[in-house]
Every structure is written in C-alpha cells, then in structure tokens.
Regions:
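Beta-strand/loop-rich accessory regions of lumenal/periplasmic or secreted enzymes
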Residues: 21-23, 55-216
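Short, small-residue-biased leader/transition segments that mark boundaries at the very start
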Residues: 3-8, 217
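Functionally constrained cores in energy, signaling, and assembly domains
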Residues: 7-9, 32, 76, 104
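Exposed aromatic-hydrophobic patches
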Residues: 12-19
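M14 metallocarboxypeptidase catalytic domain recognition
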Residues: 11, 29-30, 66-67
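Short, intrinsically disordered, charge-balanced linker/junction segments flanking boundaries
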Residues: 1-4, 209-210
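Terminal connector regions
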Residues: 20-59
Length: 217
C-alpha cells in the first residue's frame, strides 16, 4: 500500500486503504520514499522497506487420504487428477496434475545461490564452496511412505558428500496439496541457502510462486 505521512514523527499509524482478506495468506509491503531531493539523496529514493505477513486459517477440504502404491523401485501417491512418484534412490521424480507432467528432473535439496557483491567482498564463495555441489550430489539413501490420517507422508533421507544427513517429509492430502518439511541435522549451521530445487518443464510458461522477502533473488 502507499500513503503519505510526515517522516518527522517517530511513529505513524496509517489505516489500510483496502479490506483485509478473511481467509488465506496476505502480505503487506510498506516502503518509505524520499519526497524531495536532499544533498546526497535524490527524490524517489527508497529509504526503508518492510513486509508484514498474516496467514488467515483456511479450512482444508475434507477428503480421504490419497492412494499409496509401493513398488520395488518407486512409491506412488495417487488421487483424483494428480499423481506423485518417488524413486527409492532419488526422491521425488514426478508430479502430474490432470495428466500434465510438471517436473523436468528430480527434485533435490539446494544450498547454494548466486553470490552478491557483498559476498564476494567477504570471500564467502571460498568459505562456503562446499555447498555449491552439496545438493547436486546429495544421495537419497532411504525412502519410506505411510498413510497418516488424511495424508500420505513420504520421507526421503538424504546424505550429503560430507556425511551430514537431511530428512525431507512430503505430506500429500486428498486434494493433491503437498506440505514439505526439511529438517536440518548437520553440524554446519552457516550456509548460503536452504531449500529445494523444482526443475519445471519448459512448456510451463505460466507459473506463479510465492517468495518471502529477503530470500535469494
């Protein structure tokens, strides 16, 4: 939202010029913009930026758990209009919605991002060089799956090249929604990024995603 305010006050309360949603995830972004030019500060300069998130509870559809199909090499999770396939030695390898394949490659953990100028100045690429390939060569050593209530939970246990372990839980409900939980168990606590890579097919030209503030660009 945008609203004018006197910057000379220590605190200012500005009502939102729109109604807040009754359900769902809402993000409010507030910026402080320099109105007039000052010595060394041009007009329009963004002096401050902040975000506030509100997650209004949304009632889930009450659907039975999807079907769990276990095979020698793969584990499948099927529901109306969707299918997930996990490879026992790879992890999540396929997501289909309404017959359309979404993934172009295996979903895998990722710990690296493009270094910024500040990172370069602090020699962080040298310090954290291990993480550049840690996710690329992470190995899925074990895959388990079970039905719990309205969910099928598949757990992929990864081992990094230095022996650290990373379990990832995929909880899939009857509507095809997948909640992912990554639990870090390693001894190294400083790393450039902690996330998952989802290689999507090039044919998917209209994809939207939600990215929280201050994550990697």
């Amino acid at each position: 939202s945008s609203a004018a305010s006197d910057v000379y006050k220590r605190q200012e309360h500005i009502p939102f010029p729109f109604a807040l949603p009754e359900a769902g995830l809402a993000c409010m972004t507030v910026t402080a913009i320099q109105r007039a030019a000052l010595p060394g500060i041009p007009a329009g300069y963004e002096a401050a930026l902040g975000q506030v998130w509100h997650n209004y509870a949304v009632a889930r559809l009450t659907l039975p758990a999807p079907q769990l199909v276990e095979m020698d090499c793969n584990v499948g999770v099927k529901g109306e209009g969707f299918e997930y396939i996990f490879g026992r030695g790879k992890g999540l390898v396929s997501i289909r919605y309404n017959g359309v394949q979404l993934l172009d490659d295996t979903v895998r953990p990722n710990f690296w991002r493009a270094p910024t100028n500040n990172d370069e100045g602090c020699a962080e690429p040298f310090t954290f060089a291990f993480w550049k390939t840690a996710g690329l060569y992470a190995r899925c050593d074990n895959l388990t799956a079970e039905t719990k209530g309205d969910f099928v939970i598949a757990r992929a246990n990864y081992t990094l090249p230095d022996g650290q372990t990373l379990p990832i839980d995929f909880a899939i409900d009857g509507a095809g929604r997948c909640d992912i939980t990554m639990t870090w168990q390693g001894t190294r606590t400083e790393l450039p990024e902690f996330g998952l890579l989802f290689p999507l097919r090039r044919e998917l030209t209209e994809v939207s995603y939600l990215c929280l503030l201050y994550t990697s660009d």
